[in-house]
């Protein structure tokens, strides 16, 4: 049973979500139970945007610049894979905190620009890599830091997500989808993130 979090001295975090496909999971989760309030949605998919906007009763935008003018504290990026870094930079510069789906950036230059913008604005940026927060990875972190498994000197990570052809087509329709053209070695967050989270180290 989920208990409602008490926020007696804290105001709700007003959140806007860009992307009404994958982003719907974030829109649903941004509620008062976790001290958040969904206030705006943004997408170029007008039909779906209108449908989801009506469901949640929030403002909708097809223009990202206008979306950023909305009165909100944070932006959740669930748009296209290769768009995250430039969209995050714009949101940070607009005074918004940012949580971004993976990947954070697709080039080193984008990564540098993103880090510099975070430092310049002082706003919070979070990469929403979800796999470290599964129950078994949480337990592995506990075991590692408690010393119950001894001293760890080497670790590797691998992630496999078996899916039926029907499910693959459902989440990755057509050759223009990023999963169809992106080299698999570019998307290794589920393999590396748990290791980094469990050990508090950076892979080499």
Which residue ranges define each predicted feature?
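N-terminal Rossmann-like dinucleotide-binding module
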Residues: 1-56
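Predominantly a Rossmann-like dinucleotide-binding segment in NAD(P)-dependent oxidoreductases
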Residues: 21, 131-204
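Rossmann-like NAD(P)(H) cofactor-binding subdomain of soluble oxidoreductases
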Residues: 83, 103, 126-132
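Rossmann-fold dehydrogenase core element
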Residues: 113-130, 150-154
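Hydrophobic residues in well-ordered beta-strands that form the structural core
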Residues: 62, 99-100, 125-127, 156
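Beta-loop-alpha module in the N-terminal Rossmann-like domain of NAD(P)-dependent dehydrogenases
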Residues: 56-117
């Amino acid at each position: 049973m989920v208990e409602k979090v008490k926020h007696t001295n804290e105001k709700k975090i007003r959140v806007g979500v860009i992307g009404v496909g994958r982003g719907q999971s974030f829109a649903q989760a941004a509620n008062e139970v976790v001290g958040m309030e969904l206030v705006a949605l943004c997408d170029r998919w007008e039909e779906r945007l209108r449908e989801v906007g009506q469901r949640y009763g929030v403002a909708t935008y097809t223009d990202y610049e206008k979306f950023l003018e909305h009165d909100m504290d944070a932006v959740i990026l669930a748009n296209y894979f290769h768009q995250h870094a430039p969209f995050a930079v714009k949101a940070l510069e607009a005074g918004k905190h940012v949580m971004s789906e993976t990947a954070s950036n697709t080039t080193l230059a984008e990564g540098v620009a993103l880090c510099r913008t975070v430092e310049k604005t002082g706003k919070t940026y979070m990469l929403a890599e979800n796999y470290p927060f599964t129950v078994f990875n949480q337990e592995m972190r506990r075991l590692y830091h408690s010393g119950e498994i001894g001293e760890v000197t080497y670790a590797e990570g691998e992630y496999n997500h078996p899916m039926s052809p029907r499910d693959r087509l459902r989440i990755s329709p057509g050759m223009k989808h990023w999963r169809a053209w992106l080299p698999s070695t570019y998307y290794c967050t589920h393999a590396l993130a748990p290791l980094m989270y469990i050990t508090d180290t950076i892979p080499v």
